[in-house]
Amino acid sequence: MRPARALIDLQALRHNYQLARETSGVRALAVIKADAYGHGAVRCAQALEGEADGFAVACIEEALELRAAGIRAPVLLLEGFFEASELALIVEHDFWCVVHSLWQLEAIEQAAVAKPLTVWLKLDSGMHRVGLHPKDYQVAYQRLQASGKVEKIVLMSHFARADELDCPRSSEQVAVFEAARQGLGAEISLRNSPAVMGWPSVPSDWVRPGIMLYGSTPFEENNSVAARLQPVMTLESKVICVRELPAGEPVGYGARFITDRPMRIGVVAMGYADGYPRHAPTGTPVLVAGQRSRLLGRVSMDMLCVDLTDVPQAGLGSTVELWGKNILASDVAQAADTIPYQLFCNLRRVPLVYCEG
């Protein structure tokens, strides 16, 4: 069997969830959209059920997968519904629903629902992606209350730049949100992972931890909370071939790396078809046989090369960690000019192996 695999540490996942709740001091929805950022939504939900106050996914298809697996905890649809016909399923399965557009509000008003909904009413406080305009927010709230179709409303918005701690934009968004909700007595939810970790003064009754659940920081540098995160995914494979090359020899497609001395090169069963970034440059960190080393040359579809020259204990069959508990996904992402979110979500073809610790 091909040795590439991703180990998913469910104990670390629970630790990170508890850290988010402890840090914020309020209830927390575990964000497991996009198949739990590549970690497997069903298994992650099963590991957290009984501890999590609820879950958040992007769409009804992701939510239905959880219900089919027996997950009974509240599930919030972060993008709400795309067609009015989905409302029947939302009611049937007791999903919570974001309302971010006037057409969704009108659909609820016109729907014949068997029981009232829980709605998270989203304000566009400055990200300008989805959300109601501040001038429409109070009216939308009043219309939902008057509709007879809604039993609870939570007020929410989303930060655009909370991962930039010196940027005033988040404070400006809070001010817009506070002005828009003035006089409304509902619960609120503003804080995502960077806001949980870096903006403790932002008010919230609910937080929505995403990337921090999986043990990765949204910040370029660690802070006190980031230092306590535990990586959940360890992407690893093995050395399947060893080459002894003299100085001046090219390695891989395009001869992007030329040996500058006699070198030992390890070929690893991992490539961009598995989700490892093709544009990761020479020097991207890896761990080989327990020792830190580096990527060499261009990443191929199914293979990549690593430097074994100064790792004498490494050889055929040695384990290579591409990211995980020793090689942080954020370090790989920085080297490859991407973000940990994309590394995790791009993972494919690699089997997920679940473990506890």
From Swiss-Prot:
Pathway note: Amino-acid biosynthesis; D-alanine biosynthesis; D-alanine from L-alanine: step 1/1
Catalytic activity reported: L-alanine = D-alanine
GO cellular component: cytosol
Cofactor(s) listed in the protein's UniProt record: pyridoxal 5'-phosphate
Record's keyword annotation contains Isomerase: yes
Binding annotation for substrate: 129, 301
Record keywords, A-Z: Isomerase, Pyridoxal phosphate
Gene Ontology molecular function terms on file: alanine racemase activity; pyridoxal phosphate binding
Tree of life domain: Bacteria
InterPro entries, sorted: Ala_racemase, Ala_racemase/Decarboxylase_C, Ala_racemase_C, Ala_racemase_N, Ala_racemase_pyridoxalP-BS, PLP-binding_barrel
Residues the record lists as N6-(pyridoxal phosphate)lysine modifications: 33
NCBIfam families per record: alr
PANTHER family assigned to the protein according to its UniProt record, in alphabetical order: ALANINE RACEMASE (PTHR30511), ALANINE RACEMASE, CATABOLIC-RELATED (PTHR30511:SF0)
HAMAP family, alphabetized: Ala_racemase (MF_01201)
Family statement: Belongs to the alanine racemase family.
UniProt name for this protein: Alanine racemase
Taxonomic path: Bacteria, Pseudomonadati, Pseudomonadota, Gammaproteobacteria, Pseudomonadales
